[in-house]
Amino acid sequence: MLRRSIHTTKILQKPNATSHIWSDFTTRPSSLSIQSSKVKNYLFQKKASLDPPSISRRSNRIKYSPPEHIDEIFRMSYDFLEQRSSKFYELANKTKNPLKKDALLIKAEINNPEVQYNFQFNNKLNNVKDIIDYDVPVYRHLGKQHWESYGQMLLMQRLETLAAIPDTLPTLVPRAEVNIKFPFSTGVNKWIEPGEFLSSNVTSMRPIFKIQEYELVNVEKQLYTVLIVNPDVPDLSNDSFKTALCYGLVNINLTYNDNLIDPRKFHSSNIIADYLPPVPEKNAGKQRFVVWVFRQPLIEDKQGPNMLEIDRKELSRDDFDIRQFTKKYNLTAIGAHIWRSEWDAKVAAVREKYGLPPGRVFSRVRR
């Protein structure tokens, strides 16, 4: 019977002081540590004297028996990875290129069990900065992987299946995760799935956006533009449809963690087109409402942020050309979202609330 022997001389060497990089929190963010003392004590206990806190029932905790020598193997692996992490930190401190430095910092923390625990067992969307801090490169890396594994694919499938691409913009290379909810209308604190049908009552008040950047950006200077457009407004004179601008925001500043675009936070100067809720007309069919998020052009040599100056009087909300708008102001699309709506019994009340005229009623035969 053949046995595989593993040479562990280097691993079992007594580590020096600099190798304890993961356990020294004098300069490290607290988000790189497990916040639960019970979980942390169990993870790093020297003897298997504690019951696993992840098992809720006491009877099951008592029955639990860990694999033989698992604690010794874990400690050996932890010491090895921690020593290797310190080398990546040394390289990162010598590197001036921001992208290369981020890559080294990710390698230094990607195998940290505390980081993996924090990300896997906590809310990634409504993140708490003390647990999942997107200012830290490794959390942005893990967040991007998680988003690309499902959320990004779902978004692109809905945008292409519902023909929001190319009916609004020709294409999208998604770089940031965009989420939207309407908490002020019905009080339902729910993030909307792309392509979901929403009643006119739900969308009757302004939404909240969450824009999660995963790439390295200059958060002090980078500004954003957010547009909501409806490409399904009936255009009877041309026997076609036209695009309406439902909401427009510019010069929005975001950070990796403070990234909620909330009407209670931004100024009126950020609004180029105030919110007009979806009010589909009867028998007009299903209408798509597409959210586009753009990075505004960034001038690195400029001291402050590059503010867009847009003449609101020149905007044609009823016949909005989003392609011309993005080209004129050199905007880069980084994310999108979409929901759908159709006529329902609440539309008349929403129209009255916003001072809009009664909607038309379409029939099979034009009158």
Curated annotation (Swiss-Prot):
Keyword Iron: no
A Pfam family per the record: PBP
Top-level taxon of the source organism: Eukaryota
GO cellular component: mitochondrial inner membrane; mitochondrial large ribosomal subunit; mitochondrion
Keyword Transit peptide belongs to the record: yes
UniProt-annotated location(s): Mitochondrion
Keywords of this entry: Mitochondrion, Ribonucleoprotein, Ribosomal protein, Transit peptide
Residue range covered by the transit peptide: 1-29
BP GO terms, sorted: mitochondrial cytochrome c oxidase assembly; mitochondrial translation
GO MF annotation terms: structural constituent of ribosome
InterPro entries found in the cross-reference section: PEBP, PEBP-like_sf, PEBP_euk
Record's function text: Component of the mitochondrial ribosome (mitoribosome), a dedicated translation machinery responsible for the synthesis of mitochondrial genome-encoded proteins, including at least some of the essential transmembrane subunits of the mitochondrial respiratory chain. The mitoribosomes are attached to the mitochondrial inner membrane and translation products are cotranslationally integrated into the membrane.
Quaternary organization: Component of the mitochondrial large ribosomal subunit (mt-LSU). Mature yeast 74S mitochondrial ribosomes consist of a small (37S) and a large (54S) subunit. The 37S small subunit contains a 15S ribosomal RNA (15S mt-rRNA) and 34 different proteins. The 54S large subunit contains a 21S rRNA (21S mt-rRNA) and 46 different proteins.
Comment field (misc): Present with 7700 molecules/cell in log phase SD medium.
Family affiliation: Belongs to the phosphatidylethanolamine-binding protein family. Mitochondrion-specific ribosomal protein mL38 subfamily.
Protein name: Large ribosomal subunit protein mL38
Species in which this protein is naturally found: Saccharomyces cerevisiae (strain ATCC 204508 / S288c) (Baker's yeast)
